[in-house]
């Protein structure tokens, strides 16, 4: 059974995550240990996304900026790429550092990405029949991970900065 805040669903019993291994935009290892000791907002997207991904990352960045005086510790904002063929760490670094605040990017093999997406109910599929400028269909949910690296809550789309500002202080 889970309880629902105004714009997110909080799990009564957070679900521990299993191991996965990705590479962060700065070249360091990004794994389950990277999610411990600090709350994290995970979003799965890709750098060539024309709309949902940049908008969601902007909304998360703006929410964190607004929450600076309202919460003791701001959550990390992490974009996991669902397009590892094009999203190298260098490209991902340029992309995530263009947003306000400390946005982290991570990428890896499809198998490792699926280890994480499978645990969180995130779907993604590349439309590679479109040529080199293909799109990637993906879930737009934002997942809140607690300090124990457990799936704690989900923000379902559509998102707005205000939704994150209203619900995050109630949860963190």
Provide a role label for each language-model segment.
Residues 1-19, 23, 171:
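N-terminal targeting signals for export/organelle localization
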Residues 17-18, 39-40, 139-141:
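Short loop/turn microsegments at loop-to-beta-strand junctions
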Residues 24-25, 146:
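Short, acidic, Ser/Thr-enriched surface-loop or helix-capping motifs
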Residues 32-56, 60:
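Short active-site neighborhood of thiol/selenol oxidoreductases, capturing the structured segment around
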Residues 38-39, 55-80:
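Conserved helix-turn-beta segment immediately C-terminal to the redox Cys motif
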Residues 74-87, 102-111:
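Thiol-based oxidoreductase modules, predominantly thioredoxin-like and allied folds used
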Residues 93-139:
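Short, internal strand/loop/helix patches
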Residues 130-172:
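Thiol-/selenol-based redox modules, centered on thioredoxin-like
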């Amino acid at each position: 059974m889970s309880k629902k805040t105004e714009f997110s669903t909080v799990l009564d019993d957070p679900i521990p995550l299993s191991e996965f291994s990705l590479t962060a935009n700065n070249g360091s290892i990004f794994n389950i240990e990277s999610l411990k000791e600090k709350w994290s907002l995970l979003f799965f997207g890709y750098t060539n996304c024309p709309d949902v991904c940049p908008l969601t990352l902007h909304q998360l960045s703006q929410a964190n900026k607004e929450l600076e005086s309202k919460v003791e510790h701001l959550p990390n904002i992490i974009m996991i790429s669902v397009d590892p063929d094009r999203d190298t760490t260098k490209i991902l670094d340029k992309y995530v550092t263009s947003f306000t605040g400390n946005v982290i990017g991570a990428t890896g093999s499809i198998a490792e990405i699926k280890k994480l997406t499978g645990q969180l109910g995130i779907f993604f599929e590349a439309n590679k029949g479109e040529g080199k400028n293909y799109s990637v269909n993906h879930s737009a949910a934002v997942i809140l991970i607690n300090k124990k690296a457990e799936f704690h809550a989900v923000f379902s789309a559509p998102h707005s900065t205000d939704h994150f500002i209203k619900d995050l202080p109630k949860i963190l």
